[in-house]
Regions:
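Active-/binding-site microenvironments in catalytic and ligand-binding cores
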Residues: 1-96
Length: 96
């Protein structure tokens, strides 16, 4: 399964992305969660991105259907206290 490595995270930060949309979880370590207790400090990519003010929208579907020429992403998360993430409804508007 895909994941972001540190080189990819550094590229995202260096190019000053404001948000990243993925169709997979960003950290490789997330794959260990069913097998063992995974500690917050192990989410190196997660912290690299968030510490630079970049948001993640992950586990999306059908990203290949977006042309990318003139696309607007609208993501509306549920309000949840004490979390750094939440379920959301995400819509891509492709302005041909």
């Amino acid at each position: 399964a895909p994941y972001l490595d540190l080189d990819a995270a550094n590229c995202i930060v260096e190019n000053k992305f404001i948000s990243v949309c993925l169709d997979f979880p960003q950290d490789y370590i997330a794959r260990e969660m069913p097998k063992r207790m995974v500690y917050n400090k192990e989410f190196e990519i997660h912290h690299k991105i968030f510490d630079n003010g970049i948001t993640f929208i992950e586990d999306l579907m059908n990203l290949g259907n977006i042309s990318g020429n003139d696309t607007q992403i609208c993501a509306v998360p549920l309000k949840m206290d004490c979390f750094d993430g939440a379920p959301m409804r995400t819509v891509a508007i492709d302005w041909y």
